[in-house]
Design a protein with these regions (language model features):
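Face-selective signature of the C-terminal outer-membrane beta-barrel domain
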Residues: 101-121, 139-320
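N-terminal periplasmic accessory domains that precede
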Residues: 1-2, 22-45
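Structural signature of Gram-negative outer-membrane beta-barrels, strongest in the C-terminal barrel
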Residues: 279-429, 433-437
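Short acidic/polar hinge/loop motifs at secondary-structure boundaries
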Residues: 1-16
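Transmembrane beta-strands of outer-membrane beta-barrel pores
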Residues: 48-52, 63, 74-80, 116-124, ...
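Transmembrane beta-barrel wall of Gram-negative outer-membrane proteins
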Residues: 43-78, 85-167
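Surface-exposed loop/turn segments flanking beta-strands in extracellular/periplasmic regions
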Residues: 186-208, 252-276, 373-403, 450-472
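Outer membrane beta-barrel strand-and-loop segments of large Gram-negative receptors
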Residues: 224, 410, 429-476
Length: 476
C-alpha cells in the first residue's frame, strides 16, 4: 500500500507452475501487472472508511492518426491501520506519467513506452501518547522514490521466423530517512564504547538521563537493463516458439547509514559502530536465458512443452569472493497434456494434467556479502568513584576489530517439482497441485570462538582518598 496504487492497473496476469527461464528468483509462478496505456476519460475517486482516506484522479489522452497516447494520474492516501496508534499510520502521495508511441514502417514496427513515476510516503513528527515524556521522544520518517523506464519493442511483419525484439531499461532513486529522538534513562552506570580503532582506550560512562539523536539515512539507486528476442516456426500440427536474452541488475546505496553520537547511543546496550551505506560496494547480477515452447496437436489431444535454462552470475566483486564471475545454471521445464473436450449437458468439460521441474539460484544479499565489522570491547578497568563519579571514575577498554566476511559463500539452490490436474467447466475451474520443494542450503549467521588477550586491573587497589583525578593505570 505504501508504493502501489490500484487506479492505474489495467490487468493482472497470474502465471502458475514452474516459472519461465526468463524470470529469476522465482519458485512458484508469477504475478504480472500491466498498467493502463490508452485513452481514458477523466476519472476521480474518493474513498473513506475507518482505516483510510483515498483520493485519486487520472486521464488518458490520445492524438488521432499519430498512434500516440499519454496517461497521467496521481493520488493521495491517508492510511490509519490502527486509528488508536498513530505510530502505525502513514500518508502516501503518488504521481505517474506514461507514454505510448507507435511507428509503422514497411518492414518493421516499433513501440516506445516510457514512464516516469514518483511515490512519497511521509509521516509527521510522532510521539507515543502513553509516555509522560512525549515532548522529548519522537520520530519522523520520510520515503521518496522516483523512477524512469524506457521500453522499446520491434516487430517484423514480413519475417516469419522472428517475432519481436525487446529492449527494456529502468533506473530509480530513493531517499529513505528515519529521524528519532529518545530519552534514555540508564538503570545504573553503563559503559559506552567509543573507540573506532583497535587497541586500548578509555570508554565513556552513561551516568544519568540523556537525550539521544538518531538518523538512519538511505539513498538506494537501482538500474536494470534487459534485451530479449522472440522467434517462432509453425507447421500443420506443431508450433515452436523460442526466446533468448540477457539482463543486468545494479543496486547501490549512497546514504549516510546510521548516524549518532557514540557517547550518547540510542540504547545503553548498543555496541555497534556507525557505518555509511555508501561505503558498501554495489551489487551487480548478470543473467542470460534461453527457452523453447512447443505445441503438438495429437489428434484431439494437445501437448505443450516448455524447456529452458537460465544462467546467473554476480559480477563487480573482489576476486577473493568465490561467487565472483562464476555462472550458475538453472534448468526449467514444464509439460501439459490437454484431453479432448467432454460434452456434459451441452457444454464442454475440459481436463488437463501438467507437471514441471525447476531450479532457482538465490544469491546472498548485501548484509551477508559485506557484513559490518565485529567489535569486541573488553573492559580492563571499571572504576566508579562514589564520591566524585564524574571527575574520578574511569573505564578502560581494549577493542578488537574482526572482519567476519565469508568469502567462500555459495548461493542457495532450490529444487522444485510439481504435478497439477485442472478441470474447467463453464468458467469454473478446479485445480489440484502436488509439489515437492527441496532447499538444503541457505544463509545465516553463526558464532565462533577465538582467544583474546587483555589486562585485568584490580580496582580495589585504588586509593580513593588520594585521587586528584581518574586513577592512572601505572599505579594499579
Amino acid at each position: 500500500m505504501r508504493t502501489l496504487t490500484t487506479d492505474d492497473i489495467e490487468s493482472v496476469e497470474i502465471v502458475r507452475g514452474i516459472p519461465s527461464a526468463e524470470y529469476g528468483n522465482l519458485t512458484s509462478g508469477m504475478v504480472n501487472i500491466k498498467r493502463v496505456r490508452k485513452a481514458t476519460p477523466l476519472t476521480a475517486r474518493f474513498k473513506a472508511d475507518e482505516y483510510s482516506k483515498l483520493f485519486s484522479v487520472g486521464k488518458g489522452f490520445t492524438v488521432p492518426n499519430h498512434d500516440f497516447t499519454l496517461n497521467v494520474d496521481g493520488g493521495f492516501l491517508d492510511s490509519k491501520v490502527d486509528p488508536r496508534n498513530n505510530l502505525e499510520n502513514y500518508k502516501r502521495v503518488n504521481f505517474s506519467v506514461r507514454i505510448s508511441k507507435l511507428w509503422r514502417r514497411d518492414k518493421w514496427e516499433m513501440t516506445w513506452t516510457p514512464s516516469a513515476d514518483y511515490t512519497g510516503s511521509f509521516d509527521n513528527v510522532k510521539t507515543d501518547p502513553d509516555l509522560s515524556y512525549q515532548k522529548i521522544d519522537k520520530y519522523k520518517s520520510s520515503y521518496n522514490r522516483a523512477s524512469l523506464t524506457n521500453n522499446f519493442k520491434w516487430t517484423f511483419p514480413r519475417l516469419k521466423w522472428i517475432k519481436t525484439v525487446n529492449l527494456d531499461a529502468s533506473v530509480s532513486a530513493q531517499s529513505d530517512q528515519l529521524k528519532r529522538t529518545k530519552l534514555i534513562s540508564p538503570q545504573r552506570a553503563t559503559v559506552a564504547p567509543t573507540g573506532k580503532e583497535p587497541g586500548v582506550h578509555d570508554g565513556t560512562y552513561l551516568f544519568s538521563e540523556y537525550v539521544a539523536d538518531y538518523l538512519c539515512d538511505g539513498k538506494p539507486v537501482n538500474a536494470f537493463l534487459k534485451a530479449k528476442g522472440e522467434f517462432g516456426w509453425e507447421g500443420a500440427k506443431y508450433r515452436l516458439n523460442a526466446k533468448a536474452g540477457g539482463e543486468w541488475n545494479y543496486s547501490k546505496n549512497f546514504g549516510k547509514g546510521q548516524v549518532y553520537d557514540l557517547s550518547h547511543p540510542i540504547s545503553t546496550s548498543w555496541g555497534a559502530r556507525p557505518r555509511a551505506y555508501s561505503d558498501i560496494p554495489a551489487l551487480q547480477n548478470l543473467s542470460f536465458f534461453l527457452e523453447g515452447n512447443t505445441l503438438f496437436l495429437l489428434g484431439k489431444n494437445k501437448l505443450e512443452l516448455q524447456v529452458g535454462a537460465r544462467s546467473v552470475t554476480q559480477i563487480g566483486m573482489s576476486e577473493r569472493y568465490l561467487l565472483q564471475g562464476k555462472p550458475y545454471i538453472d534448468p526449467r521445464a514444464n509439460a501439459q497434456w490437454s484431453f479432448p473436450a467432454i460434452p456434459v449437458a451441452g457444454k464442454d468439460l475440459h481436463i488437463s494434467i501438467s507437471g514441471g521441474y525447476g531450479v532457482t539460484t538465490k544469491m546472498p544479499t548485501l548484509d551477508y556479502l559485506y557484513p559490518d565489522l565485529w567489535y569486541n570491547d573488553i573492559v580492563q578497568l571499571n572504576y566508579y568513584d562514589v564520591n566524585k563519579p564524574l571527575e574520578y571514575s574511569r573505564v578502560n577498554i581494549i577493542t578488537y576489530i574482526e572482519d567476519i566476511t565469508n568469502y567462500d559463500l555459495k548461493p542457495a539452490r532450490n529444487h522444485k517439482w510439481e504435478v497439477r490436474g485442472d478441470i474447467s467447466f463453464e468458467g469454473n475451474r478446479l485445480s489440484v497441485t502436488y509439489f515437492h520443494e527441496n532447499l538444503t542450503s541457505g544463509f545465516r549467521t553463526s558464532s565462533f570462538y577465538a582467544p583474546f588477550s587483555y589486562r585485568k586491573y584490580d580496582h580495589s587497589a585504588v586509593d580513593a582518598s588520594g585521587l586528584q583525578g581518574p586513577p592512572a593505570l601505572e599505579n594499579i
